Swiss-Prot record:
Name of the protein: Mannosyl-3-phosphoglycerate phosphatase
Listed NCBIfam families: HAD-SF-IIB, HAD-SF-IIB-MPGP, MPGP_rel, PRK03669.1
A molecular function (GO) term: magnesium ion binding
GO cellular component: cytosol
PANTHER family reported in the protein's UniProt record: HAD SUPERFAMILY HYDROLASE-LIKE, TYPE 3, PHOSPHOSERINE PHOSPHATASE
Organism placement in taxonomy: Bacteria, Pseudomonadati, Pseudomonadota, Gammaproteobacteria, Enterobacterales
Primary subcellular site in the record, as a coarse category: cytoplasm
Keywords on record: Cytoplasm, Hydrolase, Magnesium, Metal-binding
Length: 271
């Protein structure tokens, strides 16, 4: 199997996985985060959140300096020591937030789709929606390559909206609480593969990878991991992978950071 000592990368979703979906608590995972940090194992956060939000969380969690995947893979924040890589400190995949916003405004105006984006409201409203402080809510609006929205139309109209976005080279992705529009070329899996390849190029050896997630939008990330933890989540659809070999995939009984801890216990403590 694998051990905490060998070259290893841990990729983790945030809301509903490392963070509690409601309280944003992460303390049940704290002992494992400390052990991984002491073993120099990078814990690479992957989320629909903005890089500004995630850099704040990195500091809170004691994970500064390592790369992270923001906006569902449309943004890669590079590791501090990767300053020689083109694009430092961030790599943007596909078209910009501003360009996507223009597309959405046109679709809403001409085809009358009903939705509310984070750009339509102020930080106080987002704080009410999310339970975040206003200062943290302000960070959620600093998108660089995606748009976050609340869908307010029918399922039939959603199918039409998704089709129109696909025609325009965009994708519509469901997150833990909100929907996200980003370039069709972007994804957590592509971003993770790029980071893995970069670590391999720098060290001369491909690291073993472990991924943790709780929602359907985490499936592409977990598919490209060597080992995966599917944290019990609130989403009705759940997470379904092509390869669910029990030697590779563990489904937790607990939710959020307690499930995160359970997954690490399964793959490391028992061996």
């Amino acid at each position: 199997m694998f051990s905490i000592q060998q070259p290893l990368l841990v990729f983790s979703d945030l809301d509903g996985t490392l963070l509690d979906s409601h309280s944003y608590d992460w303390q049940p995972a704290a002992p494992w985060l400390s052990r991984l940090r002491e073993a120099n194992v990078p814990v690479i956060l992957c989320s629909s959140k903005t890089s500004a939000e995630m850099l704040y969380l990195q500091k809170t969690l004691g994970l500064q300096g390592v790369p992270l995947i923001a906006e569902n893979g449309a943004v890669i924040q590079l590791a501090e020591q990767w300053q020689d890589i083109d694009g430092f400190p961030r790599i943007i995949s596909g078209i910009s937030h501003g360009e996507i916003s223009q597309v959405l405004n046109t679709l809403r105006e001409k085809e009358h789709f009903k939705f509310t984006t984070f750009d339509d409201v102020d930080d106080a409203t987002i704080a009410e929606w999310t339970g975040l402080s206003r200062s943290q809510a302000a960070l959620t609006q600093l998108h660089e390559a995606s748009v976050t929205l609340i869908w307010r139309d029918s399922d039939e109209r959603m199918a039409q909206f998704t089709a129109r976005l696909n025609e325009l080279g965009l994708q519509f992705m469901q997150g833990a609480r909100f929907w996200h529009v980003l370039d069709a070329s972007a994804g957590k899996d592509q971003a993770a593969n790029w980071i893995i390849a970069t670590y391999q190029q720098l060290s001369g050896k491909r690291p073993t990878t472990l991924g943790l997630g709780d929602g359907p939008n985490d499936a592409p990330l977990l598919e490209v991991m060597d080992y995966a933890v599917i944290v019990k989540g609130l989403n009705r659809e759940g997470v379904h992978l092509h390869d669910e070999d029990p030697a590779r995939v563990w489904r937790t009984q607990r939710e959020g950071p307690e499930g995160w801890r359970e997954g690490l216990d399964h793959f490391f403590s028992a061996r």
